[in-house]
Amino acid sequence: MSDMTTDELLPAIEELQPHFMGKGSVKQLSGGNINIVWRVDGDPDSLIAKHAPPHIATNPDVPLSNERLSFEARALSLFSSDGRLQKLANQSIRPPVLLSFDPDRSLLLMEDVGDFTELNRVKMDTVPSKITGERLGRFIGKFHRTSFMDNEFRDSFKNIEIQKVRHQLQYEPACTYGDWDDPSTKAMIKKRSRDLGESLQDTGTCLVMGDLWPPSVFVNETAAIRLIDWEFAHFGRPLQDVGHFAAHCWMQRQVDESNNASDWWDELWRSFIDGYKHAAGDCYSKLFNSEEKNNIGIHIGTEILIRAFGPFRDGYVYDPFEEGHTVLYDAQKAAADFICEPNAAIEAFGF
C-alpha cells in the first residue's frame, strides 16, 4: 500500500461520508510521528482524517503495521452510544467520535477537536490543573478497572506489533541513550529495560490507551478533555498509561523555568494519581500489585531517556538543550534512579 495523497483523500471522504459538506480546504497537520493526519474543512463542522502507512510516517525506514488504525477504530467505537464503555464517556471527558473507518485504505475519519488545546500548549492561568488532572485520572482509573481481566477485551485488543516496535525503539536500546560512566548502572538499565520490554509483548491485565502524553490530551478552559490517538490501544499493563503520563509530567516540570508552571505540572500529576486511585477503588491493589510497582519506574526512566537522548528527542522538551547541559544530566540521573531503584519511582510519584 502506498501512502495516501491529499488528492486521493477527498474522493475517499465523499465515499465514506456522503453527507459531509466539504469546503475544499485540506491541511496536513504537524506534530504526529506515526501517521499522516489532515484537517478537512466542512460545513458546519470540519473532520480529521488519519492515514496509517506501513511505516512510521516521519521515518519510512522503520516499518510499522498499518493495523494500528484498526485498533484505534475499535477503541473509539467502545465509547460510542452502543459501545461497551459508553458510560465512561461524557462531555467532560471522552475520545473523539468515530465517523468512518476504511481498513482497505487504512483511513480513519473522526470528529475534529480543534476547539481544544494540547495539554502542553495551554495557558496555565486559564486551565485548572487540579480539576484537569483529577478528571483525567478518574477516567483512566475507570478505564483500567472496567476492563480488568476481561477476556473479550483481551481477545480483541492484542496489539502486539506496536509492543514489538516500542521494545525495539525504547526498551532494548535504553542503555545506549545517554552517557554512562558506571558500567554496573548501564548493565542494570540494559537488563531491567530489556526484561520489561519483552514482558510487555504479552497480553496483560487491562485495556490501555497506550500513548497517554500531553499532545494526546486536549483540554479547554472548563477543563473538559478530549483524548486522541488511540492506535496504541492494547490489552496491556497499567504502567503503560500511568507510568507514561508520570514520565511526561516529570519532564514538563523539569524543563520549565517558571515556578508557577512547575507547580502546575506537579499539581496536575498529584491530582491525576489521586483521581486514578479513587476511581480504581478496591481494584487499585490488583492493577498495581508489587510487580507493577516494581516495574513502573522502568517505563518512566526509559521514556525520559528516549526523549532526552533517543529518536524522539526532536521537537519535544529536551530539543533546545545541547549535549552536556545540566538539564540533560539531571534527566539522565533521574532516569537511572527510576529504572534501577523501584522505590525511587514509587516515592516520587506516589504509587
Go through each PLM region and give its residues.
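Juxta-kinase regulatory segment immediately upstream of eukaryotic protein kinase catalytic domains
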Residues: M1-K27
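Active-site catalytic-loop/activation-segment of kinase and kinase-like phosphoryl-transfer enzymes
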Residues: M1-T6, L108, K142-F148, E152-E198, ...
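Active-site acidic catalytic loop and adjacent metal/ATP-binding pocket
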Residues: K27-G42, L47-A49, R194-Q240
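ATP-binding pocket architecture of kinase catalytic cores
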Residues: R39-E152
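A glycine-centered beta->alpha junction motif in the catalytic cores
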Residues: H51-T58, M110-T126, R145, A174, ...
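Short, glycine/acidic-enriched loop or turn micro-motifs at the edges of active sites
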Residues: P53, G114, P214, F232, ...
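Active-site activation/catalytic loop segments of kinase-like enzymes and analogous catalytic loops
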Residues: R74, L239-D282, I300-D319
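ATP/Mg2+ or Mg2+-diphosphate-binding catalytic cores
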Residues: L287, I298-F351
